[in-house]
A protein has these predicted regions:
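Charged DNA-binding/catalytic regions of mobile-element recombinases
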Residues: 1-212
Length: 212
């Protein structure tokens, strides 16, 4: 399942901003595609979805795409394209603020990054350059607490189990050498299982059908 959303990227000029379109994989937390635009539209969202599918090579594997109920997310243009692709569409429930938690959490991580410019960006090009660096650092270097401190890229590539097994072996050896330093079990380095948007809460998923 992918989650996507749009967030503001402020300019140095008061009242001006750009829109960050961002798609992530909720299982691995990996950023799979993003773009910066001067407007919100279903057409721009459609193009980003196409690019994400091409980049991840999953044209033949229909996904579920989750979002809130913003205008670009519910536009006919996007719905029609998802119908062509055979993708399912999931939306946040009306008046429920935490139904898109993964995208919201990622935007918080992004905007609380120490290198986020407090006074805004100088230009559209500057925003894009910043996002390129952030994507690289987040996907390839950031040890994500939600996936047991491996990087999103490692989780996405399926190498997390081997890494976590090595960590567990290191901890067990340390415990055997110095048992007095350990009052209980070592840290749990098991691979995390399935994830969900909001455990225990029904989520509406619809299959998009093109209008005749």
């Amino acid at each position: 399942m992918w989650s996507w959303d749009i967030s503001y990227c402020p300019s140095e000029v008061r009242g001006q901003h750009w829109y960050l379109y961002l798609i992530m994989d909720i299982y691995s937390r990996k950023i799979v595609a993003w773009e910066i635009h001067e407007a919100e539209s279903g057409e721009l969202a459609k193009k980003l979805i196409d690019r994400a599918l091409l980049r991840e090579r999953c044209w033949q594997n229909p996904l579920v795409l989750h979002s809130d109920n913003g205008a670009p997310m519910t536009s006919y243009t996007l719905k029609a394209r998802l119908a062509e692709l055979g993708m399912l569409m999931s939306h946040s429930r009306p008046r429920v603020s935490n139904d898109n938690p993964y995208s919201e959490s990622l935007f918080k991580t992004l905007k609380y990054c120490p290198k986020w410019p407090a006074k805004g960006f100088a230009s559209l090009t500057a925003v894009r350059k910043w996002m390129l660096l952030f994507e690289q650092a987040y996907n390839e270097e950031h040890l994500h607490s939600g996936i047991n401190f491996v990087t999103p890229a490692q989780w996405h590539q399926g190498v997390d189990a081997k890494l976590l097994a090595k960590r567990e072996a290191v901890y067990e050896r340390a415990k055997s050498l110095n048992p007095r330093r350990w009052s209980g079990d070592t840290r749990n380095w098991e691979v995390a299982g399935a994830v969900s948007l909001n455990p225990g809460k029904l989520q509406e998923i619809e299959f998009n059908k093109q209008a005749a």
